[in-house]
Amino acid sequence: MESIGIVAPQTMHFAEPLRLQSGSVLGNYQLVVETYGELNAARSNAVLVCHALNASHHVAGVYADDPRSTGWWDNMVGPGKPLDTNRFFVIGVNNLGSCFGSTGPMSIDPSTGKPYGAKFPVVTVEDWVHAQARVADAFGIERFAAVMGGSLGGMQALAWSLMYPERVAHCIDIASTPKLSAQNIAFNEVARSAILSDPDFHGGDYYAHGVKPKRGLRVARMIGHITYLSDDDMAEKFGRALRRADGALDAYNFSFDVEFEVESYLRYQGDKFADYFDANTYLLITRALDYFDPAKAFDGNLTAALAHTQAKYLIASFSTDWRFAPARSREIVKALLDNKRTVSYAEIDAPHGHDAFLLDDARYHNLLRAYYERIANEVGA
């Protein structure tokens, strides 16, 4: 199926200060946005796609100056794809605190003329949703046909349905959770500790030193990447295969250099990530993950937290996802059903772990295609 083709981002500037959940106020900020498809006359066919930890506004298509720059969900969004841009107007927003053009730690603090660095305020999922709502306002979109996301993006979709219930017709929440478990918070803490203990971190102000805490960021990514894959998937891809420069397949080096294929893979992923991602952004986004817990204000009662939602829901999980296991999605489903909301739920049998939500799986895509067909019929798209 064809890609949407060449796309270009746009930068939106906001002068009205944004009060964050922490109490900090962010003024004169910018958000980078990409759109695909055409907004209909009734402005009823808009879909917001929320991104996960290391992704961005670049959901689909490619950039003219880099044909390898395929959007992170290009298999899902485009002409004739499950989220069909011939029928829907799709928006991707790069969240505050990111390192892909929206205001974040790498941006210049107007009060100092230097990068914010560690002084950039902690942001939350709720802060992102408020900022995204201003993007919707700028496009004149009063109500989204759907807000959709996977993983951390799914948390944003759920938050949209809570915070702006009248502005969301459908919430599509994939491979997500209503809150992080202690184990997930622990993984994030180990990853942050790797960054914070890197000598090149310099308290978060490494920009002034002309360095990046690549060693810490590399380890953080390696830790995270392990949690995105299933044990079966890793066994299938790597097993205990050895990686030897001399071509020998059955002998150990008896050293601490790379011996196994899985070690080589993790180091490659870590090095690649450390080259393009920002360490301060990693700290911010993992903390936003930790803080997300809409039931907290309701004494841990998720049913009470979701009582005022109005959207219809599609909740999807993957059988081998142990980062955000199917049981976490079922918690959301139960709370919605307790509130007599309209909910569709699917647990997809897939071997790829948490990352399955990014992959081109026929059953998964058919599910989304059918659901968007239903939405298209509702809005006349």
UniProtKB/Swiss-Prot annotation:
SUPFAM superfamilies recorded: alpha/beta-Hydrolases
UniProt keyword list: Acyltransferase, Amino-acid biosynthesis, Cytoplasm, Methionine biosynthesis, Transferase
Catalytic center residues: 151, 321, 354
Record EC number: 2.3.1.46
Gene3D superfamilies: 1.10.1740.110, alpha/beta hydrolase
Tagged with keyword Secreted: no
Binding site for substrate: 221, 355
Subunit structure, as described in the record: Homodimer.
Protein name according to UniProt: Homoserine O-succinyltransferase
Encoding gene, per UniProt annotation: metXS
